[in-house]
Amino acid sequence: MKKALLLLAAAAACAIALPATAARNKTLKGSGRIVTETRDVGSFHAVEAGSIAHVLVGDYPAGRVTVKTDDNLLVHVQTSVAEGTLRIGLADVTVQNAELTVYVPAAGITRLDAKGIAAFSLETPLAGITGLKAGGAAKITAEHPLQTNDAAIEASGTAHIAVEAMTGTLERIS
């Protein structure tokens, strides 16, 4: 009797949880109509990107980012700063056939963290980098050598980090 009640309770919990999860993460298809929006985000020293974000780090105005994406996805793009970290990604949706490019100022950045299939392209020399981290199928590439005294580089999954560094101490964590 106890087993039957336990199984019934577990089945009821699954029946409630599965539709709630599916509703929270709906799938959107990119419209193909690309729009651009500039957002004031304040100051930050680290950037964390997830989802399908392609983040271009370069000589852009400080304190703001520019988001380029399909018009129907713009409201789902998160660009928020908490504890000095700019977080970029999509909120509560998965996407198909979509673009998400975010232009981020290089000034003052010390740490980059790419997750999922996010990609960072470093367009300008960066000084003072202390950490690069990529997980999942994420990618970090740099057009110019990084200038740093101490840096930790960590890649997991099928992630790829391709950078040159002029450094005092470089620690590779895999």
Where are the language model's segments positioned?
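Intrinsically disordered, low-complexity terminal regions
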Residues: 1-174
